[in-house]
A protein has these predicted regions:
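Small-molecule kinase domains that catalyze NTP-dependent phosphoryl transfer to phosphate-bearing small molecules
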Residues: 108-143, 161, 166, 170-179
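Post-Walker A helix-loop "phosphate-sensing" segment adjacent to the P-loop in P-loop NTPases
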Residues: 23-30
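Switch/connector loops and helix/strand junctions flanking conserved nucleotide-binding motifs
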Residues: 64-67, 92-99, 144, 175-178
Length: 194
């Protein structure tokens, strides 16, 4: 059985990722209450169970107790139940923009500001990011790019590549691209004398 927990920041694309995993043949459940998780895992861990690929969306909606999730994951480790955690993240400014576009309120902002809710959420789910098998930053991803990444990880059986090399052209006067980790070469054409 392949058991995937899809989690991450609100607005980073968890629901979209779950829909894509469902299209890839996964049995998907979104926003399962954490107290039901042990029974859910136990039910689908039986060898004669027909469902072999499960994706479970867990997030901060509904004020779930993430301390309880840590205990459940520890218990799964003790029982040697294999699972993978897919953590979807995005830059704060991108998350704020997405909330503005949808005109939805962040689950932890209450009647306050979205950026305050994002900061609270980052703090609460940091332990999940630390335990994550895969971390995807969706800040600059299009939906089709997210689908390709998920297919690489969950369908084609390819190992997740931690090193990507992208050759791109940019002008320093506009700044280094924000998704660039390292700019190795700066090539300028010398001025021509004629």
């Amino acid at each position: 059985m392949r058991f995937v927990i899809v989690t991450g920041m609100s607005g980073a694309g968890k629901s979209t990722a779950l829909k894509m995993l469902e299209d890839m043949g996964y049995f998907c459940v979104d926003n399962l209450p954490i107290p039901l998780l042990p029974r859910f895992v136990e039910m689908f861990s039986e060898p004669d169970e027909e469902v072999k690929k499960i994706a479970l969306g867990i997030d901060i909606r509904g004020g779930q107790d993430f301390g309880g999730l840590k205990d459940v994951l520890d218990e799964m480790d003790v029982k040697e139940i294999e699972y993978e955690i897919l953590f979807l993240d995005a830059q704060d400014d991108v998350l704020i923009k997405r909330y503005k576009e949808t005109r939805r309120q962040h689950p932890l902002s209450g009647s306050g500001r979205v950026d305050t809710g994002i900061a609270k959420e980052r703090e609460k789910i940091m332990f999940l990011k630390m335990r994550a098998t895969y971390i995807l930053d969706t800040s600059k991803m299009l939906t089709r790019e997210l689908k390709l990444e998920l297919e690489k990880i969950f369908v084609k059986g390819q190992n997740f590549c931690n090193l990507y090399i992208t050759v791109m052209s940019f002008g320093f006067k506009y700044g280094i691209p924000s998704d660039s980790d390292l700019s190795l070469i700066h090539i300028s054409e010398p001025t021509r004398p004629y």
